[in-house]
C-alpha cells in the first residue's frame, strides 16, 4: 500500500537551493564539539551496540543522528523522510528522541513508529520514498545494552562504506559537504506498523492458513509483543503467548531466542504443534518442535530451502550462511543437490553475498533468516509464519521433518567475557592464543573446524569447535577457552 505511505509535503530540502544549503550554522556544533570515542570502529556486525551510559549516550545518539542524516542526504537522489523505531528497553525512548533530534538538525523529516520490530523499519523504508531507516535496539542483548541500526533506502543494512562516512563525521575527519538552512520535522506515524503486519500475511493468505495449529510464541518482553500474536491469530492459529508485554527491565532476560527452555516446556505442556522464540527486536527467531526439541537456524534454512527447491524457487539450489553453519547441515544439503556459500558472521554479510550471487535464501544458525522472495532483510515474524505454514502443508509434525533432515556434527560454542574493547577486538595479536588455534587445527585436520572471533554485538570472544565426535570437541574447546581466559581476560 505504497500510496498511503507517501511523504508529507513541504519538508525542507525539496528544492535544489535548499539542498545546497545543507548544514548551515551547525557545522561547528556537530563537527568540532566531539565526544570521546573508542579507538576501534563504532559499527560492528549489526550497527553500533554497547552499554548505555558507557558507549551509548544521548549525546552520541544526537551526533549519530546528525551524521546519518548528512550521509543519507548526500547519497540520496531525492530528499525523503527517515523512518525511526525502537524496542522496549528503558533507554530506547531517550536514544530515539536524541537520534531524531540529530536527523531533524540535518534537515530531514522523521517518521517515528514507536515500538516495532526491526524488519518493520526495513520493509517500510523499502516501499516508501524514505531515504533510510534507523532502529534503536540491541537485539538479543540484555536490558542494560542498546544499539543503533541504520538501513539504506532499499531497506537493507547500510553498506559499510556509508557506515564509515558516518563514523568519519563523528570523529571530526570530515565536514558536511552541504549545509542545512532549515530543520526537519518529527512526525508520529504509529499507524504504519499495521502495513507491515498486512505484508507478513499477504503471501500466505491466498494459499494457506494456520487453522488447526496450536502455536506458542515467546515475545521476550520486546518489540514483537502485540503484533506477533495478532498476526498468527488472524492466520487462524490458536496462540499461546509468553513474555508478551513491553518490559524494558526484562527484555531478553531468561527468555526469547537465547533461552528456549521455558518455550520448550510450554509446547510440551500444551501439546502444541510448534513454538517460536524471538529476540528483543524480532529480527531473528528459533523454533521448538512438538517434542520440545530446539530447532536452530541451520534446520530452518534446510527445511525452507528444500521446500523452495521442490517448488523451483531456489536459483542454483543456493543457500548462503556463515562460518557458523554446522558441517552436518552442509553435507546433507549437498547430498540433495544443494550449494552452500559461507560468509563471515553477521546478517549484513549474508545479505551482501545473496545480492552478489542472486541467492534467494540465507541466514545464520542463530536465527537471522532472509528469504528475498518476501523480504529485504532478516525477519523473525515472517520466518516463523512460513515455517508454520510449511509444517501445515507437509501434513506431518516438525519433529518428523527435522528427523528426516540431517544429523549435526558435535559443536560447542563458548563465550569468554572480555570487557576491554581494544583487547577484545585485537585478540588476533595474542600469540599464545594463535598458537593454540594452530595446534588444534593441525590435530583435527579435516575432521573438524575451529572458529575464534570477537563478537560484534557483545563484550565476548566466541570460541566454536566442531568435530566428528564429542570427545574431540570437548577437549579442544576447553583448551582454547583456557588460553583465551589466561591471556585476554581482564
Curated annotation (Swiss-Prot):
A molecular-function term among this protein's GO annotations: phosphoglucosamine mutase activity
Protein residues bound to Mg(2+): 139, 279, 281, 283
HAMAP family: GlmM_B (MF_01554_B)
Protein name: Phosphoglucosamine mutase
Cofactor note: Binds 1 Mg(2+) ion per subunit.
Single GO BP term: carbohydrate metabolic process
InterPro entries attached to this UniProt entry: A-D-PHexomutase_a/b/a-I (IPR005844), A-D-PHexomutase_a/b/a-I/II/III (IPR016055), A-D-PHexomutase_a/b/a-II (IPR005845), A-D-PHexomutase_a/b/a-III (IPR005846), A-D-PHexomutase_C (IPR005843), A-D-PHexomutase_C_sf (IPR036900), A-D-PHexomutase_CS (IPR016066), Alpha-D-phosphohexomutase_SF (IPR005841)
EC numbers for this chain: 5.4.2.10
Active-site residues, Swiss-Prot/TrEMBL: 139 (phosphoserine intermediate)
Keywords assigned by UniProt, alphabetized: Isomerase, Magnesium, Metal-binding, Phosphoprotein
Necessary cofactors: Mg(2+)
Record note on modification: Activated by phosphorylation.
Catalysed conversion reaction: alpha-D-glucosamine 1-phosphate = D-glucosamine 6-phosphate
PANTHER family named among the record's database cross-references: PHOSPHOGLUCOMUTASE (ALPHA-D-GLUCOSE-1,6-BISPHOSPHATE-DEPENDENT) (PTHR42946:SF1), PHOSPHOHEXOSE MUTASE (PTHR42946)
Post-translational modification Phosphoserine, affected residues: 139
GO cellular component: cytosol
Pfam families: PGM_PMM_I, PGM_PMM_II, PGM_PMM_III, PGM_PMM_IV
Entry superkingdom: Bacteria
Gene name tied to this protein: glmM
